[in-house]
Structures are given as structure tokens and as C-alpha cells.
Swiss-Prot record:
It comes from Polaromonas sp. (strain JS666 / ATCC BAA-500). Gene3D superfamilies: HprK N-terminal domain-like, P-loop containing nucleotide triphosphate hydrolases. Coiled coil: none annotated. PANTHER family: HPR KINASE_PHOSPHORYLASE, PROTEIN YJDM-RELATED. One of its GO terms (biological process) is regulation of carbohydrate metabolic process. This is HPr kinase/phosphorylase. The keyword Metal-binding applies. The gene is hprK. Homohexamer.
Length: 316
């Protein structure tokens, strides 16, 4: 699901301190919003802000030093025509950056059309960077997943599985081994670009881990600040299964790496059987270390296949 609403006043207030901007025109249009069709069509929120562009009117239009010069360094009629064209396109917001002074014609036209315009002393490039990051998160495709989301060796790992298999207990064991908790039970996932999924904890569950028989644990209070993380990028899913499920549904040694689709992005997946006597925390750490090696181009399974092939050739 992708949200489609952000109003001019919310955009202004959320960045009043960071961008030091002022609302200079169109104060009566505080509820003006992005075009919903444009938001749904955008590949990411980053597409919704940029320098002055007549081809993409749905963007937040940024007017830096060059753009203001383009609008003012011609005859009065030409300048008025160029400014009028911007107003006709009805962008959600105009931002005059680089400590430039908005032309009087632009101010008056924005006021008549009730088009919100902000002015900031910050550089146009900085404004674009800040707004792209904000809009990418705000308009990101999102979903929730049940599990325990951890930072294990610097990799964002989601622990999933059937109810009663000890996901939270496993999370507690990993925390005691020096890894970090992002979220337990409900994990909010955001697709922030074409290849990246970011996981966060709902504010209500921040720093909390539920363990059966003990109840809710405040991980930050018990283990300290370094035991929790605010967010992580999802790189791997560890799925816990019972023995009968593993034998029925999965290969013992899959030839191709398993993946799971999350918001349209394939995420590496590892299946671990839960059984009495198995140290699942050690197995999860080993799986993560192996994944890190694979990301570096070291594939143990392929190396084994190559050794086996060479051994067979020698026997022949």
C-alpha cells in the first residue's frame, strides 16, 4: 500500500527548522496536496521533487539561482509568460532557494492562484536532498510482517516461523550474544527505492520483546542503548520450521538460493529446522556469516560442486 497524501502545511512544518524557510505566498492553500495519480505513478518519492521542470509539473518545483535568473533575465513580457506557465501547471509547492528573492510577478501570481510558495536561504541542492529523503519515506510502498527483526553482524535479518517455535526466545539469545533488536512481533517494512527495504518498529512496541512465561521485556533498559536499533535494511529472512515441515516442503541442500518476495523485491531466505538440542542462535549466526561471504562472491556450495566435478573427472 502506498499513501498518497501530504499537504503543504505538513511539508512546511516538518522542515521549518531544517530548511529555515518562510511561507511567502499562497497561505490560503495549506491543504494543497500532491496529485494522487502522479504519486501512484512515481517510481519513488524522490521523483516528486526537483529543479524547475515544465515536463513534470506534479513535482515540488525548486527555483535556485539559475532558475530565478531564467525567469527574470528577459523582457517583462517574456518573464511574465514563463512565470504564468509555471502557475498554469499547478505544482503542489514552489520553493525559492539559494537565498534568492522571488520575483514580484511570481509572488503575485502565486497569491492569486493560491499556490504555496516557500523561500529558504539554503542551497537548492540541499533542499532537494532533504525533500527527496522525506518524500521517499512518506510515499514508500509499505507492509507489516510478523516476526523478530534483528541486526546480526550488521545485516538486517527477519526471523519468521510458525507460532510457538521460539522466535522471541531466539531473539533474546541473539541479543545476549551482542546483536541488536529492531522490532518484535510486528515489523513495519518500507520499500524506499527499487532495491531497498527498510524495517522499523511501530512506536507502540519500541524496544520491547515479548517472551512467553516472562512477559514484556524492555531490551534497552535491560541490555543498554547498544542492544536496540532504530531501523535496518532487510537483507535476509530466517524462517524457522518443524522437522516434518522441512522434510515435506524444502530440499535439504537447495541448488539455488531461496528468496522471498517482499514488496516486489526478492530477499534472501534461509530455512532452519527447530528441534530439541539444536543451538538455533549459532545456526542463525552461521547462516548470516555465510550470506556475507556470498555477497563477497564466495559461494561454498558452488565450490563444493566444482570439487566434486574435478574428483569425478580424476576417477574417470
Amino acid at each position: 500500500m502506498k499513501p498518497t497524501v501530504v499537504s503543504a502545511d505538513v511539508l512546511f512544518e516538518d522542515h521549518r527548522a531544517a530548511l529555515k524557510w518562510q511561507w511567502v505566498a499562497g497561505l490560503g492553500a495549506s491543504e494543497r496536496r500532491f496529485d494522487e495519480v502522479a504519486v501512484r505513478a512515481a517510481r519513488s518519492g524522490a521523483d516528486l521533487v526537483g529543479y524547475l521542470n515544465y515536463i513534470h509539473p506534479y513535482r515540488v518545483q525548486i527555483l535556485g539561482e539559475r532558475e530565478v535568473a531564467y525567469l527574470t533575465n528577459e523582457s517583462p513580457d517574456d518573464c511574465a509568460r514563463r512565470i504564468s506557465r509555471i502557475i498554469t501547471l499547478e505544482p503542489p509547492v514552489l520553493v525559492v532557494a539559494d537565498d534568492q528573492t522571488a520575483p514580484d510577478t511570481l509572488l503575485s501570481m502565486c497569491e492569486r492562484a493560491q499556490l504555496p510558495m516557500f523561500a529558504t536561504p539554503e542551497s537548492a541542492a540541499f533542499v532537494i536532498d532533504v525533500l527527496r529523503a522525506y518524500l521517499s519515506k512518506h510515499f514508500a510502498d509499505r507492509t507489516s510482517m510478523h516476526g523478530v527483526f534483528m541486526d546480526i553482524l550488521g545485516m538486517g535479518v527477519m526471523i519468521t516461523g510458525e507460532s510457538g517455535l521460539g522466535k522471541s526466545e531466539l531473539g533474546l539469545e541473539l541479543i545476549s550474544r551482542g546483536h541488536g533488536l529492531v522490532a518484535d512481533d510486528a515489523v513495519d517494512l518500507y520499500r524506499i527505492n527499487q532495491t531497498t527495504i527498510e524495517g522499523r518498529c511501530p512506536e507502540l512496541l519500541q524496544n520491547l520483546l515479548e517472551v512467553r512465561g516472562i512477559g514484556l521485556l524492555d531490551i534497552k533498559a535491560i541490555f543498554g542503548e547498544t542492544a536496540v536499533r532504530r531501523k535496518m535494511r532487510l537483507k535476509m529472512i530466517v524462517h524457522l520450521v518443524r522437522r516434518e515441515t522441512l522434510e515435506r516442503d524444502y530440499e535439504r541442500i537447495p541448488y539455488e538460493p531461496l528468496t522471498q518476495d517482499v514488496l516486489g523485491i526478492p530477499v534472501r531466505k534461509v530455512i532452519i529446522q527447530v528441534e530439541a538440542g539444536r543451538n538455533i542462535a549459532v545456526l542463525v549466526e552461521a547462516a548470516v556469516r555465510n550470506a556475507i561471504l556470498q555477497l563477497r562472491g564466495i559461494n561454498t556450495y558452488q565450490e563444493f560442486v566444482e570439487r566434486h566435478r574435478k574428483a569425478m573427472e580424476q576417477d574417470d
